[in-house]
Regions:
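Alpha-helical transmembrane segments of multipass membrane proteins
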Residues: 34-38, 53, 80, 106-110, ...
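Transmembrane helix-loop junction
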Residues: 56-57, 113, 122, 194-195, ...
């Protein structure tokens, strides 16, 4: 098994070096990633723009998914830092949920690694469609959550309590999805946390960010070790999405979030349709 993994790594790395994208492709990816970063900053859903773009530029589906995961992972730190204070008092929750997140992310990454390219490409339209539906439902779900959550310390998670076995299993399942594809995992986590009994929306966002960092991080490491990452594209995407999140978001914030959500939903539906008819 180790020899097979080593051969796959060397073969994939060599193929990736021969498949270095052109300057025009890199420029396109940088621009799309910047827009995706801005969308993530104000509404989420940037993956629904960047992932189909990589496919449209000829990047294999599995490599596109792996590259996106690696490229977008550093941005998770910024989100986590913004909510780090909200984890005060729920360190036990964070520590316990991190374990199934890591295991789930590893399982999801492993599942992707053993999925043949043809089969993954066949289910990609459904993954994009499902993620688009999750994104479209984000507004109603967040309104439902806000109606049942609070932002004050009185409604913080009890310090003495820990997640139940059912909660850990639920987070493991979210981690598997996050490691395998991941788009829309954030809104799924918020819903799961609410069902777990958490009522402080800021704490829920903090837990969402740290757990996303866990399952995306271990998945990214797995993809990198197995040689599935197109590093020139990953670097350009990381720079572009970071720039978009910090600069373009200032401009995009002048646009109502509802407009951005409708646009991303339309892009997701169009991408799913295109992926279905073009494969």
């Amino acid at each position: 098994m180790a020899a097979t993994a080593a051969r796959r790594f060397l073969t994939s790395f060599a193929d990736m070096m021969h498949a270095t994208p052109s300057a025009w492709h890199l420029l396109t990816i940088a621009l799309i990633s910047a827009v995706g970063g801005a969308i993530n900053a104000i509404a989420g859903g940037g993956t629904l723009l960047t992932f189909p773009t990589l496919l449209g530029l000829g990047v294999p589906a599995v490599a596109a998914n792996a590259t996106s995961t690696v490229a977008l992972w550093p941005g998770s730190f910024a989100s986590l830092m913004g909510y780090r204070r909200e984890l005060d008092g729920i360190e036990r929750w964070a520590a316990h949920l991190a374990v199934p997140s890591l295991l789930g992310g590893l399982g999801g990454a492993g599942l992707l690694l053993v999925t043949p390219e043809e089969r993954f490409r066949a289910i990609v339209p459904w993954l994009v469609l499902g993620a688009t539906m999750l994104f479209a439902l984000q507004g109603p779900v967040m309104r439902w959550l806000r109606g049942r959550t609070h932002a004050d310390p009185e409604h913080a998670a009890p310090r003495a309590l820990s997640p139940s076995l059912g909660m850990l299993v639920s987070q493991f399942c979210v981690g598997v999805y996050g490691g395998y594809f991941g788009a829309g995992a954030g809104i799924v986590m918020l819903g799961v946390f609410r069902l777990m009994g958490l009522t402080n929306i800021h704490q829920m966002n903090g837990l969402k960010n740290i757990n996303g960092l866990c399952f995306n991080g271990i998945a990214a490491a797995s993809f990198a070790i197995m040689g599935l990452v197109n590093w020139p594209i990953a670097l350009v995407m990381a720079i572009g999405s970071s720039a978009g999140g910090h600069t373009m978001a200032r401009v995009a914030q002048r646009v109502p979030q509802a407009w951005v959500r409708h646009a991303v939903t339309a892009i997701g539906l169009a991408s799913a349709t295109w992926l279905a008819v073009s494969r």
